[in-house]
Amino acid sequence: GMPEIQRIIIEQRSPMTAKDISRKYNQLTRPDWENRRVQIMRWALNGKLLYNWKTFGELLDSTGEKYIVEDSPKDTFWGAAKDGNIYSGVNALGRLLMQLRLQYRRLNKQKNIILKPPQIENFSFLGIPIPAILVDVTNEPYGANIHMW
């Protein structure tokens, strides 16, 4: 939903500016966001990996078997807050990145990978339903301004 707001946000050069603009529209967040946010973030991270296969994939792989933690004292759902030597929180982003690391290792020898949209009602971008996307992961770099729609 809200293609005009999505367009304003993606036109920003600064991620922080985009985030600040998005906060003005918090009341328009999808009603099912709390139940769908992990599914949507998984899809977004998969897209990030597929379009940055070598650089992002190698970065993930370089972490070995270490835990990945989003150090975030303010958001203990996506991250975890450090208290001394202990982190407490859900660390959903860190967990998703560790899953992505395994996926990268499993798929690393493939050339073409399909990114399927999550099975979510009204999952669209700029008013267009998000389709499955076939990505040639050997064709990097794509550039910072790739637009899939």
Please report, for each region that a protein language model flagged, where it lies by residue:
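Charged, low-complexity intrinsically disordered segments
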Residues: G1-W149
